[in-house]
From Swiss-Prot:
EC number(s) from the headed UniProt entry: 6.1.1.15
Transmembrane region(s): none
Disulfide bonds: none
Originating organism: Lactococcus lactis subsp. cremoris (strain MG1363)
UniProt keyword list: Aminoacyl-tRNA synthetase, ATP-binding, Cytoplasm, Ligase, Nucleotide-binding, Protein biosynthesis
Protein name: Proline--tRNA ligase
Keyword ATP-binding: yes
Record localization: Cytoplasm
Entry superkingdom: Bacteria
Keyword set includes ATP-binding: yes
Pfam families: HGTP_anticodon, tRNA-synt_2b, tRNA_edit
GO BP annotation list: prolyl-tRNA aminoacylation
């Protein structure tokens, strides 16, 4: 492929509106262009990468018996009314009317559409299981589209759906998809973790996310590729390292998810679902007499602990929440933070919100900071399981400026139930006891759900089972954010290349170090001077030879200065660059391996073998 025939509009500088490095490099290297807020055009290079990702997916889904189809993006609102999501999905749903004033939507996902198709065609368990998927454009009216392809209004998604007559069949397909996803992301070269996740608005029971880990900006060795004349990072002057660190610091760590994983273990979960080891305390502690004490000006846990000279673990914090139409009191230990997702899931609520200060004062006669469980009537009290272990606790007295000491559950106040409601902290023990918990930022690239009968019951998608009974089909749902996967790859494979000039000056620049299986082309042939007849003859010879060996080759046949060509080549980020320069008449070329920065001069006859050896 000739570069002069392609649309690769590189930029000399990083775009000023980019906040994450993947967005900046996709724009600067000419992979994408923004058409409007949250909407991007995938230019030829990006499209080639996306096609390679799609082909990897198709190969792995073929292995598990998933069949590709293509559903419409313009969907009738009637199906979404059947499932109940037309009213509940929220403002992110694109709603529109046709000329007959009928309601339609632009599909953000296709559970209703697929279920409608299946219910109209399948009536017997004998035709199940059915496993279908599509790779198509989706739409979501994001209030604040940002971070390039990571949070857009139009995006490319692979969404799969499976239908089953029994739970064992659903469980088997769910596991098949989990393994297929792991293979896909491994082939993409990603550092990722499958984690326990919240099903959220999708509904259903079991749910697992696949998160691409985004690196911090501290470990320079991860980010740097050194030229062949720099032996180690220690050789780079501190002033240059400081400049590099400053450059790294300009870019946000991408990823809206915080994941929790066990260092030294297998446990991993979204922070919304993460838990830690819980060991009930069986030691006997004498219950002391309840005592009301003045705590003037002490409202926070830290202030109360300091005033009473006690450990914060000896205190109980009282929160008040609206859960749908019910007011609920929540008890937590010390400075533990309430995990609202855990609370929502436990209550089965569709809506929760913290009560206001005014509401609390009107209901209980005290402000937050002096609120406590003793004497509360006609209100539901739920506590985190750690609260049950606290003996002789300090709690608010429901009078501003006062607290109780030596409060004990069962004697001084009642709790309806103790459940896991807290957000875990880094350094706690994994729930399986294998390793300590660490936090990391990450990008959600895949999500699988066991939806059960969430949609099939609502839409009357029934079959006759082996006994002739009418039952709702069981359903699974499996998604991969294909376009955001491109951004996740760049977040992990962006590199800063450091070179030392003949004058002993150190220079650095951003580049993309694409995994070999995903790079838009395998090899970049760069003739320095297109007016040099010997160079162009050798370029044509090498292109033909490399293509004959199965390589995908991009030839920079533009009449540009060498510096422009090399800068663009570095930005584009193909795994191998072959430079055809002044020694072309002798059959000598220069080979540069992007992943390592290694550069060698070789004879043209050694090119194929050299590339194979150096690329391993």
């Amino acid at each position: 492929m000739k570069q002069s025939k392609m649309l690769i509009p590189t930029l000399r500088e990083m775009p000023s509106d980019a906040q994450v490095i993947s967005h900046a490099l996709l724009m600067r290297a000419g992979y994408v262009r923004q058409v409007s807020a949250g909407i991007y055009a995938y230019l030829p290079l990006a499209n080639r990468v996306l096609e390679k990702l799609k082909n990897i997916m198709r190969e792995e889904f073929d292995e598990i018996g998933a069949v590709e189809l293509l559903a419409p993006s313009l969907l009738t609102a009637d199906l979404w009314r059947e499932s109940g999501r037309y009213e509940t999905y929220g403002e992110d749903l694109y709603k529109l009317k046709n000329r007959d004033s009928s309601d339609f939507i632009l599909g953000p996902t296709h559970e209703e559409t697929m279920t409608s198709l299946v219910r109209d065609e399948i009536t017997s368990y004998k035709k199940l299981p059915l496993n279908v998927y599509q790779i198509a454009t989706k739409f979501r009216d994001e209030k604040r589209p940002r971070y390039g392809l990571l949070r857009g209004r139009e995006f490319l998604m692979k969404d799969g759906y499976s239908y089953h007559a029994d739970q064992d069949s659903l469980d088997e397909t769910y596991l098949d998809y989990k393994k297929a996803y792991e293979k896909i992301f491994e082939r993409a070269g990603l550092n990722f973790k499958p984690i326990i996740a919240d099903a959220g608005a999708m509904g259903g029971k079991d749910s697992q996310e696949f998160i691409a880990i985004t690196d911090d900006r501290i470990n320079l060795e991860k980010w740097l590729v050194l030229s062949k004349n720099i032996t180690s990072i220690d050789e780079i002057p501190e002033s240059v390292l400081s400049e590099i660190q400053e450059e790294l610091g300009k870019w946000l760590v991408a990823g809206e998810d915080t994941i929790v994983y066990a260092e030294g273990g297998d446990y991993a979960a979204n922070i919304e679902m993460a838990t830690s080891q819980f060991e009930p305390n069986v030691a006997y502690t004498e219950e002391l007499e309840l005592e009301k004490v003045a705590t003037p000006g002490a409202k926070t846990i830290d202030e109360v602990s300091d005033f009473l000279e006690i450990d914060e673990e000896q205190t109980v914090k009282t929160l008040v929440y609206h859960a749908d139409d019910e007011l609920i009191v929540i008890l937590l230990n010390g400075n533990d933070q309430l995990n609202e997702v855990k609370l929502t899931n436990h209550l089965g609520a569709s809506f929760i919100e913290a009560a206001s200060e005014a509401e609390v004062e009107e209901k209980f006669g005290a402000h937050f900071g002096s609120l406590g469980p003793i004497g509360l009537e006609n209100v539901r009290i739920i506590a985190d399981r750690k609260v049950e272990l606290i003996k002789n606790a300090v709690v608010g007295a429901n009078v501003d400026g006062y607290h109780y000491k030596n409060a004990n559950f069962g004697r001084d106040f009642e709790v309806e139930e103790f459940v896991d409601l807290r957000t875990v902290n880094e350094g706690e023990i994994s729930p399986d006891g294998r390793g300590t918990l660490k936090f990391a930022r990450g990008i959600e690239i895949g999500h699988i759900f066991k939806l059960g009968t969430r949609y099939t019951e609502a839409m009357n998608a029934n079959i006759l089972d082996a006994n002739g009974r009418s039952i709702p089909m069981l359903m699974g749902c499996y998604g991969i954010g294909v376009s955001r996967l491109l951004s996740a790859i760049l977040e992990q494979f962006a590199r800063i290349y450091v070179e030392k000039t003949p004058r002993e000056e150190f220079k650095f620049s951003w580049s993309i170090n694409f995994p070999k299986e995903l790079a838009p082309f395998d090899i970049h042939l760069v003739p320095v001077n297109v007016k040099d007849e010997a160079a162009m003859e050798l370029t044509s010879e090498l292109e033909e030879k490399l293509r004959g060996k199965g390589y995908q080759v991009l030839v920079d046949d533009r009449n540009e200065r060498a510096g422009v060509k090399f800068a663009d080549s570095d930005l584009i980020g193909l795994p191998v660059r072959v430079t055809i320069g002044k020694k072309a008449a002798e059959g000598i070329v220069e080979v540069k391996i992007r992943a390592t920065g290694e550069v060698v001069e070789i004879n043209k006859d050694e090119l194929v073998n050299t590339i194979e050896i150096l690329s391993k």
